[in-house]
Curated annotation (Swiss-Prot):
Key words, A-Z: Ribonucleoprotein, Ribosomal protein, RNA-binding, rRNA-binding
Protein name (database record): Large ribosomal subunit protein uL24
One Gene Ontology biological process: translation
Keyword Isomerase: no
Matches recorded under Pfam families: KOW, ribosomal_L24
Length: 106
């Protein structure tokens, strides 16, 4: 079970974007996530008339390692850790470590 999923609001805890918040839009693999507006890089693209693209400099979000982000707890307004709790019916749910509240599925 992944502790950070698509649709979660996360806060960057390390790197040049430290302190910024965003929403996970994609899990690249088991260890990287793509967060909207975080880790922006400038890509230089050539014009391609066959595809209808113009050349220039494009800003694009790149994946960031999941160890550099933490889930954002709206109740406390801070970053929080994620724990896994086993319910009586055998289902696993994600919970905030600080409060024990269940994390709503996005």
């Amino acid at each position: 079970m992944n502790k950070i999923r698509k649709g979660d609001e996360v806060i960057v805890i390390a790197g040049r974007d430290k302190g910024k918040r965003g929403t996970v839009s994609l899990r690249k693999d088991d260890s990287h996530v793509l967060v909207d507006g975080i880790n922006l890089v400038k890509k230089h693209t050539k014009p391609n008339p066959l595809k209808g693209t113009t050349g220039g400099i494009v800003e694009k979000s790149m994946p960031i390692h999941q160890s550099n982000v933490a889930i954002f707890n709206a109740a406390t307004g801070k970053a929080d850790r994620v724990g896994i709790k086993l319910l009586a019916d055998g289902k696993k749910v994600r919970v905030f470590k600080s409060s024990g509240d269940e994390i709503k599925a996005a």
